Amino acid sequence: GYNYMKEKAILLTSDFYRSNLNFKLNYEPNKKTKLEFSTRYSRTKVNGDGQSDATGDQNSVPSGSFGRIRHAVMQSPLTGSGSLLFDESNIDDGLEDPITALNDNYKKRVRENFNMNGAFTWKILPELTFRTDVGLDIYNNDFRYFAGSTTYESQNNTLAEFKNMPLTTRTQVNRRTVRNSNTLQYDFSKILPKIHSLNLMVGQESIVSRETLATTRIEGFPTFYDADMAFHLSAQGTPTRANEFYYPDDKMVSFFGRANYSLLDRYLLTATLRADGSSKFSKGNRWGYFPSVAAGWRI
């Protein structure tokens, strides 16, 4: 299936786009085997200042640029004789008009998610079933910010030779996660008397995640550049910062088992045990064990 959504935001220069594509397939070659496959892709694009960045929106348009009513004139700017009460050069108090403020504080974010899962089930015997699952998740987040010559960022946080000149920053996050699980399940119904029912399952799961973070900053664009020009003609600026960080691989391995027992299909008992080992913890503390027991009675 496919769906697409476009939304025009209330704030000028801001809009939102989202598209989703998904596919699912189940196939049984014979009575003993089954194949399952599903995939999903989504892409979201948000333009304009109506969003927050990873730094807590510190570079967004100041609220004073929009809250003009809060700063409305509370008294006449004229004296009784009709002359100005204030110096004309200071009337605006350094504030930019809202349209300029929006255009000079422009953000563009593109998020992509890709998910793919596959499974194979094999009924080795009528009471013995094997299943393996494989999954892949890909996440990309590309955030770009343009600060024009009227912004605080351009006027105060740039190199001296690029003061009051437009700049851009870009943050890219890429994450890949691979998952695999294998389970073996046995049903003892044919072995035990009919008043008893017992099902055992054992399994193993592994998850590996890798992530990178890249940040760049380009200053010194010509003063007439807008966001679109700066994003597409980045060679006209001067790179002042470029960092790329590779996070340590995040790995987790799990072993688990479960037993389901019932007597007369009325008295129920379930016991599970799971052991998880994670690379996030130091050696000697990487393994955790999680047993549980549950009982039930059908009245």
Give residue spans per PLM region.
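Short, contiguous hydrophobic alpha-helices characteristic of membrane insertion segments
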Residues: 257-272
